[in-house]
């Protein structure tokens, strides 16, 4: 019998939320560490993005392997699984790297706040298992819909913060000239 409704693998939404928050704060902390890094900035960004992506995929795989009520193995077809996992890895990496670059190069705080929110949501959503779609469905939907939507949201937030900062800066300059 198919399970039509997903259930929380950790049995408590609070535990899932705290797990998501912890991982999100570690991810945001990685941006701060990269900011203080004296090594090659590009290499640090690639390592940080890869670590973030590996962590997100580890949560997804770990929850499915440890907490799936009715074993639903990953699809045996590597031509289906590998592209989805590969694109998910790329999306998770790009999310972290984009937030880090916007924060480090332009000083945009909205990028780090966005990273915390998106990471929290990703981990929280990954703790829900057992729906009819199977183990790969959640990751597939992330690749096709949620991931690109979150990157679009980041672009809007970053653009909005830049506009507000420029406007405030122009207002300050005008006030100083009128004195």
Where are the predicted features?
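Acidic, polar-rich N-terminal leader regions of halophilic archaeal proteins
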Residues: 1-179
């Amino acid at each position: 019998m198919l399970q039509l409704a997903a259930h929380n693998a950790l049995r408590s939404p609070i535990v899932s939320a705290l797990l998501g928050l912890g991982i999100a704060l570690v991810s945001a902390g990685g941006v701060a560490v990269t900011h203080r890094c004296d090594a090659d900035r590009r290499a640090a960004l690639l390592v940080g993005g890869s670590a973030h992506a590996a962590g997100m995929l580890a949560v997804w795989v770990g929850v499915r392997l440890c907490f799936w009520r009715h074993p639903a193995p990953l699809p045996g077809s590597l031509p289906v699984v590998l592209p989805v996992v590969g694109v998910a890895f790329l999306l998770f990496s790009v999310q972290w790297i984009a937030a880090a670059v916007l924060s480090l190069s332009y000083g945009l705080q909205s990028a780090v706040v966005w990273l915390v929110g998106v990471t929290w949501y990703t981990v929280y959503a990954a703790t829900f298992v057992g729906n009819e779609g199977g183990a790969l469905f959640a990751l597939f939907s992330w690749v096709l819909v949620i991931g690109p939507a979150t990157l679009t949201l980041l672009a809007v937030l970053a653009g909005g913060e830049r506009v507000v900062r420029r406007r405030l800066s122009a207002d300050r300059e005008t006030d100083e000239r009128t004195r």
